[in-house]
Amino acid sequence: MDQEVMDFFDFSKELNRVPGAPQGYISSDPWLMATESKSSEVPNRETIGTDYVTKIVAKEKCRLNRTLLEYQPQGKRNRTLDDLDTDDEAEETEIRRDDEYYKKFRFNLNRDKNLSIYAKREEILAAINAHPVIIIKGETGCGKTTQVPQYILDEAYKSGKYCNIVVTQPRRIAAISIANRVCQEREWQQNTVCSFQVGLHRPNSLEDTRLLYCTTGVLLNNLINNKTLTHYTHIVLDEVHERDQNMDFLLIVVRRLLATNSRHVKIILMSATIDAKELSDYFATTNSIPPVITTNHGRKHSIEKFYRDQLGSIIWNEEDVGDQHVPEINKHGYRAAVKIIVIIDNMERKAAIQSRLSYDETLRYGAVLIFLPGIYEIDTMAENITCMLENDRNIKVLIVRCFSLMTPENQRDVFNPPPPGFRKIILATNIAESSITVPDVSYVIDFCLTKVKVTDTASSFSSLRLTWASKANCRQRAGRVGRLRSGRVYRMVNKHFYQREMAEFGIPEMLRLPLQNSVLKAKVLNMGSPMEILALALSPPNLSDIQNTILLLKEVGALYLTVDGVYDALDGDLTYWGTIMARLPLDTRQSRLIILGYIFNMLEEAIIIAAGLSTNGLFAHDGGRTQLGDSFWMHYIFADGSGSDLVAIWRVYLTYLSLVEIGHDQESAIRWAKRFHVSLRSLKEIHLLVQELRVRCMHLGLIPFSVNPSQMMDDREKAIMLKVIIAGAFYPNYFTRSKDTCADTDRNIYQTISGHDPCRTVYFTNFKPAYMGELYTRRIKELFQEVRIPPENMDVTFQEGSQKVFVTFKQDDWIADSSKFVPVSGRVQSEVYKAVMMRQNRLERPIHIMNPSAFMSYVQQRGIGDVIEGRWIPPTKPLNVELLALPSVFDKTISGLITCIVSCGKFFFQPQSFAECIGNMSEIFNAPQQLRNYVNNAGDITKGMMVLAKRDSYFQRATVIRPENQSNRQPMFYVRFIDYGDCALLSMQQMRLMPRELTEQYGDLPPRVFECRLAMVQPSSMVSGNNRWSTAANDMLRSVAKSGLIDIEVYSLFNNVAAVLIYMRDGIINDKLVELMLCRRSDEDYMSRKDHDFRLRRQESARYLSSAQRQQINEEYMRSCQLPEDHDLRPPPPEKCKTVVILKGPYSPLECTMQCITRVGSSKRVNIDHLSVNALLLDADPQDHHDHLIVAHEIAENRNGHTLTARGTTLMPNVQGFGALMVMLFSPTMQLKCNREGTSYVSVLGGLGCDPETNEPYFPEHDVLINLDVNILEDDVILINQIRYYIDSVFFNFKDENNPAVSANERVSIYTQLRSIINRLLCKDRRYIERNMSNADFEWETHPDLPPPNEPFGKRAIFPMHSLTELQEEDTGRLVQLRENCSMLHKWRNVEGTLPHMTCKLCNQLLDSVPQLRLHLLTILHRDREKQIDYCNQ
């Protein structure tokens, strides 16, 4: 055979391409050609700033001046900013008395005079009476939140005037606890005079309430709905400094309504760290400037502050300074912090000598709190402290981490005292600024840094940016010390930089986070366009951000593209979807999930997932960079093989809910949460939000309906539908799991692991052949103990001359411990995921070996193997390939029986040629003299032992797998019948010890069956999950097996498993299963196709060979099929192993990457969040060359903008064309693009569409592109249009109508139709097509001759109908060329020589060698393409 061909199949040799590829090609991978396209570059859009604000604000100021100067009610209600002066409801100006009310309740007028706010009581009340707006600036603890509202209420009581006060709080817990505290102080019954409202949690009646504490969002929604402030006499906005979007929008609404119809309502703004001047200017008029009242309370203990330049050379060297203006912590900064800890310790030791307190006592109250910007910096700081203090044994520290995702146990460690003699060092993010207070902190080391979430409104990508904290933040941090004694604060910046260059306050949310909810509130407020409303913000956003937000809302269906039928880039009419989104306390895409959940009758699942996505920290983090506990794998357990973080959230919550419903106590719940590494606190928050969302949905008319049991979805259909609505909710956050379509890709995978099964194999590197690896297999197996993979579940092998160590995990359901099973999707075993996670956690792993120079003497002395000519040969078991039951290389069809069926992917076949042998053995085994060795003692049975075991009525050869785990009854054992393949659980009475003579005669006889699987098919994701075969498919195979003798065609033999086709009376079962949609067609993997090609050519040449030649060729073939064995030798004793070798790995050849399909992300590198179930992204179906779609809940961008991180990911079903179908289904509009000849559709472009006159895209950043690899036909577009019509019809309402027009019965009918059509769409067996690329992929095309589609809902459609260009007939000349190309390829298939560079024109595939060509001809893509051009190989 030609040497080039032999080299191609020799995995020990690198594959070198012969130079001389045709000019103009980058590679044979069309994806790589696509990267050169300039059309993927996002066109630069001009950034428009805040110039638009000036004119709008000036008009608003005039209105405010006019209203507060002299109120003149108008009779007409206008809706434009230019004319709006009043509301329909005239403001009450009469003084309303409430004497009867005050008689009902006890009013104690004695207030706490010890609070510092009390000294300002009269000043505050006088200011409220004199001004419409006042500002109170009071430190935390001064009493302003509880006392100021009471002062107002007391004054109203004295005068008998009606009073209704509302006080906002940014957090639910604060509103509840403060209201309860006031009730307790005043001795009022809860929910009478004083009450609270958070979300929808409120008293049944607020009739008696005169002091209401509520969240900011509650008041904001009330004011938007009522469009007046007059329901209250006083509005107190507390913690106004936080500047979240709700607060900023509330300020807009308050000022707007104050300027229109509510001038007599008093506004009180309060905060500890407030920019008083900014707020004063915001509410100032020509006649009134809001007064600022400041109150402070003195501290009991002093605080000293030190800055970086004041510490000087004590902790910093001159050369360590660096650029102090760059927000970062370099290695010198970490070291400086450690030096400060040492200085603190030395200082306290000296002070202890001079004081009465001992050093150990000072340690109890001398905790050090170090503020760091994130978890990465926390881990780095911990490593530096541990490393640098190892040399100073006198200082003992307890390092405690403090961040939002930590476990409750770790949270408690923050407050617990340290062990005697230890100093507690708390490494915290900004959560420790205000959320927690640790009394024993006496020292703060503040790097003055924080991480701020910023979202690019054009791309929707968010990023955590490391930036300088504001002075307000730093003051909050400094306030953490001095609780029990004097404290010190060390700021790691220069004093001048702190005072002159650091900002006083942080960046408001409205300038850095998405504006969707604010714009929706502006639309519901209906007092002007979003631009006109947001221009009135305290910090107005850029006009570009408003425009981008409008585009995003149009994309999610919250706004129509037009205003009164005319396109407007800065506005759009509100849809009913938008109304729902505005009323749900969620991100718009989470609200869209609920809307789609309602449409598909999966509302409960959608609500739970949306609530989980809105709550941080569900899966608890243990802390520490190097910990690889069970916490990560709990994601996989709860995801249950779905490949979805969102499904994991749903299943965690259902489990928690079942615990609540059966009445588990708190301790049991804590133990459960600890075991599964979930946060009970987060689950309780999710539970509250789920309950709130249910009520809100009910108020909106979103109520699930019941269906007949026969119409209910089974678990599999529900899983598919859930993923469909996830894809719809989070469009266009789409990624494809990239598949390199280069012809050598499959070969390279197997070459990397020397022909092992990539779905079960990982490998280490850096282990030289001279180390004699076979002697250390047990040591290598021990490395996997950290991920709890038992040694008996793996084989360790080596490749001659290679530095790789291969670890192959065994595929045996009977051996695996189900308690350690981690469900994953696809063919890859869970152990591979665990192994790769080991490497990601720590790359290098040491192993101790003997000095290679002493190795030979060691094995010779102990007689381990043989040493031949200075080369060690490990001991091996003899193998007589003639006795193997495996099909010969010359066998195409074989008759026999299927003896055992596990599934269509694993069954055992007993050739008819062995019938006589089996009969003779059975007769011998069941002779009475052979069955006398009863098993009387369970200890006599050992794992792997050969015994005689009862199968049906006869005893047969069997191997003991393992004993049953249960110990509460008589011993039982799992056994495998060697000559039949099936397993059974048997008692000792059903087993016999095999006599010695039988063991000698039959102990080494290989099984008389061989394992099989169906060839060229794989389980369908539409009928079964986790790569499992459906019950219906397995039953069909069992039915065929029961018919007796059958014929199979052997496609290939790999890893001693035969891929076969099974003949039935009316065809082949493989094809029948595809026809019945119980499975789908699939390519065979590389090794299978390689073996098939080899077998075909050997069978074609068989007639030219003698019997002896055929026997010799078959023996060589059988030996080549056997992989290296695991020798499992006892390693040398530890005292002889002094040399350390650093293994690197484990690696998997299936590790792959993702590609973002949106235009703005297509050129960026993509990672998956390290806490996701898809963080370890492997090609779970390596034989499948389709791109798999992954949908992300959120996309983050790194600091330099080059890398994206997908969060909350879901791996979509492995359905042909699924990604393209989802784009067509859920994009606002799309175009199916044709190839150059116009004969087939080759790509899908989705997005908001383009300007019909200029062809410029409305939202180019979010245009998505998928190149098709399967046929999409006109029928598919018709089905998709039907689905879009039904989705639209659920919420369609006529203009000026508030509620949808669809009835309850119609909704059930719509749901039934949706299910049916989606199943039809996804179950289609689609033909493969070649990849086509174009430099105009992202360009929207115009087809003036194409008639517009029929629009049932006109311009009020959220999902308008897609139009379709008509395909052309294939040109006859082109068909001739393609057929001639095919004919030439088939002729070259039989050539033994060098192939000139050739291209398969059908598949757009470059071919470099004859072996490559042969295997390409066996792919489904090529075979489908041949059918499409009616080519028949003669």
Swiss-Prot record:
Gene3D superfamilies: 1.20.120.1080, 2.30.30.140, 2.40.50.90, P-loop containing nucleotide triphosphate hydrolases
Residues the record lists as binding ATP: G138, E139, T140, G141, C142, G143, K144, T145
UniProt subcellular location: Cytoplasm
Helicase C-terminal domain ranges (all copies): 339-526
Gene Ontology MF terms: ATP binding; ATP hydrolysis activity; RNA binding; RNA helicase activity
Function (record text): Probable ATP-binding RNA helicase which plays a central role during spermatogenesis and oogenesis by repressing transposable elements and preventing their mobilization, which is essential for the germline integrity. Acts via the piRNA metabolic process, which mediates the repression of transposable elements during meiosis by forming complexes composed of piRNAs and Piwi and govern the methylation and subsequent repression of transposons. Involved in the repression of LTR retrotransposon copia.
Protein name: Probable ATP-dependent RNA helicase spindle-E
Organism: Drosophila sechellia (Fruit fly)
